[in-house]
C-alpha cells in the first residue's frame, strides 16, 4: 500500500459545539462556557471533502479496495471498532485549524479487513517562529470492513465481574442519532436509513455513531474529574440502538491518574457498549 495523506481545513465554529450541547441540554448539564474545544468535539469538524460515496452512504476513499488498489474487495458493513485521543495543546474555538489524515495500516484478518486511520490537528504559527505548525491533538481510529451480517446476539460481560458506580443515565433517541449525523456531516446510511440498516446490513434499526458515544461519554464524565482529560482510549463492544437507556459508569478499580469508564445498558446489567481508559 502506498503512503496516503489527506489534508482538511476547517474553522472550529462555536455554533456547532453549542448545537451539540443544545441536543442534550434537557437531559445533561450544559457545558461551562469556554473558548476551547473539549476532547472529542473535533469529531464535529473536518468532514472529508470528497463527493464519491459507497453504497452505504459513506466516503469510499478509506475502504480497502481504494487503499489497496483492488476493486474486487467488497464488504457489507464497516464498523467503528476502537480509537484513541491525545490532547497536547488547547484548541481554540472560532479559529481555523488543519487536519492531516493518514493510513497507519491495512490488515487482513480472516475474511475481514482492518483499517487504522490517524489524524493530527495542527495550528499554523506566525512566520517568524521556527516551527510552522503546532500539534494540538492526535487521534487514532480503527475501522473494520466485513461481509458478515450484524450480530443479533450482543456481546455480554459476566455479572459481578467488575465493580462500578453509575454516574449518569441517558436515553438515546432516533432523532439524537439523525441530528448528530447532520451536525458532523456524516452521510453513513446506518445512522439515518432504517430500511437500509435492516435489510442490507442486518441491524434491527439505525445505530448510534461511534464518535457520538465518545462525545457523550466525555460530556458525562468530565464534571466528575478534577482535571481536563488529556488522553482517552476506547473500544466499542456492541451497537447502540435508539431508545436504549445507557448508564455511564466508573470502574471502582481505577488507579491514580487513570480512570476506567463504561457505557452499559441500564436494563441489562451484563450488556456493555463501550469501555474507555481516561488519563488526566
From Swiss-Prot:
GO terms for biological process: fatty acid biosynthetic process; fatty acid metabolic process. Mitochondrial 3-hydroxyacyl-thioester dehydratase involved in fatty acid biosynthesis. Required for respiratory growth and for normal mitochondrial morphology. GO terms for cellular component: mitochondrion. The keyword Protein transport does not apply. Transmembrane segments: none annotated. Its EC number is 4.2.1.-. Its main location: mitochondrion. It is found in: Mitochondrion. InterPro entries: HotDog_dom_sf, Htd2, Mitochondrial_HTD2. Keywords: Lyase, Mitochondrion, NAD, Oxidoreductase. This is Hydroxyacyl-thioester dehydratase type 2, mitochondrial. It comes from the Eukaryota. SUPFAM superfamilies: Thioesterase/thiol ester dehydrase-isomerase.
Amino acid at each position: 500500500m502506498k503512503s496516503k495523506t489527506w489534508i482538511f481545513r476547517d474553522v472550529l465554529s462555536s455554533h456547532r459545539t453549542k448545537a451539540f450541547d443544545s441536543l442534550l441540554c434537557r437531559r445533561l448539564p450544559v457545558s461551562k462556557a469556554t473558548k476551547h474545544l473539549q476532547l472529542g468535539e473535533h469529531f464535529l469538524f473536518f468532514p472529508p471533502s470528497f463527493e464519491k460515496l459507497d453504497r452505504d452512504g459513506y466516503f469510499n476513499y478509506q475502504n480497502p479496495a481504494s487503499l489497496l488498489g483492488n476493486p474486487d474487495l467488497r464488504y457489507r458493513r464497516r464498523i467503528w471498532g476502537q480509537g484513541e485521543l491525545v490532547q497536547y495543546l488547547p484548541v481554540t474555538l472560532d479559529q481555523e485549524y488543519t487536519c492531516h489524515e493518514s493510513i497507519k495500516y491495512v490488515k487482513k484478518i480472516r475474511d475481514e479487513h482492518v483499517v487504522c486511520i490517524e489524524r493530527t490537528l495542527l495550528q499554523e504559527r506566525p512566520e517568524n517562529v521556527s516551527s510552522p505548525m503546532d500539534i494540538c491533538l492526535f487521534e487514532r481510529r480503527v475501522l473494520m470492513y466485513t461481509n458478515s451480517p450484524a450480530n443479533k446476539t450482543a456481546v455480554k460481560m459476566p455479572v459481578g465481574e467488575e465493580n462500578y458506580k453509575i454516574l449518569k443515565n441517558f436515553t438515546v433517541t432516533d432523532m439524537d442519532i439523525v441530528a448528530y449525523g447532520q451536525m458532523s456531516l456524516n452521510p453513513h446510511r446506518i445512522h439515518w436509513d432504517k430500511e437500509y440498516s435492516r435489510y442490507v446490513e442486518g441491524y434491527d434499526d439505525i445505530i448510534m455513531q461511534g464518535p457520538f458515544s465518545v462525545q457523550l461519554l466525555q460530556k458525562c464524565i468530565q464534571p466528575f474529574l478534577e482535571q481536563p482529560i488529556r488522553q482517552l482510549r476506547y473500544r466499542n463492544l456492541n451497537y447502540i440502538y435508539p431508545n436504549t437507556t445507557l448508564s455511564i459508569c466508573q470502574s471502582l478499580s481505577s488507579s491514580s491518574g487513570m480512570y476506567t469508564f463504561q457505557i452499559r445498558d441500564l436494563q441489562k446489567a451484563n450488556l456493555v457498549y463501550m469501555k474507555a481508559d481516561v488519563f488526566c
